[in-house]
């Protein structure tokens, strides 16, 4: 199973989906966007570096799971290599419409490449007390969220 993202300012929303991935699969591969892939984002200067994001992700995995069940790999395209991975059986994604659409697009690329399609597992995003999704963008803007106020 693969779950990919930027994982900037690793937050409870990311952790919720990672936990789901580990419950659903024996092996979890986490694709982490590189700095190069993010260089055109408008708030790029506020996004943690690849090394910082990698370290936070690894620390979280080590604190909750058997590290042997996971891997972290860099991604530099929207597909993150999922369009060419021969042994990929499932992609876990948030319920963000653009992310779900991208998963379907990658599945079509896999078919075009002669590979079997993967299962798309959609996990609802963690919401804040205002009903909006918890996100790294909101955290970068300085919004503060307390774990006891999050809605799963």
For each of these PLM feature ranges, what is it?
Residues 1-152:
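Nucleotidyltransferase catalytic core that binds NTPs
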């Amino acid at each position: 199973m693969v779950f990919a993202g930027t994982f900037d300012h690793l937050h409870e929303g990311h952790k919720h989906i990672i936990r789901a991935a580990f419950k659903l699969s024996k092996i979890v591969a986490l694709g982490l966007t590189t700095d190069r892939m993010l260089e055109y984002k408008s708030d790029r200067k506020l996004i943690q570096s690849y090394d910082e994001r990698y370290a936070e992700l690894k620390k979280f995995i080590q604190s909750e799971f058997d590290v042997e069940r996971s891997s972290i790999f860099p991604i530099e395209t929207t597909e993150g290599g999922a369009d060419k991975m021969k042994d990929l059986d499932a992609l876990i994604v948030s319920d963000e419409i653009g992310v779900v659409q991208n998963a379907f697009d990658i599945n079509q690329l896999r078919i075009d490449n002669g590979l079997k399609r993967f299962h798309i597992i959609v996990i609802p995003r963690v919401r804040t007390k205002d009903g909006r999704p918890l996100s790294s963008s909101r955290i970068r803007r300085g919004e503060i969220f307390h774990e006891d106020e999050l809605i799963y």
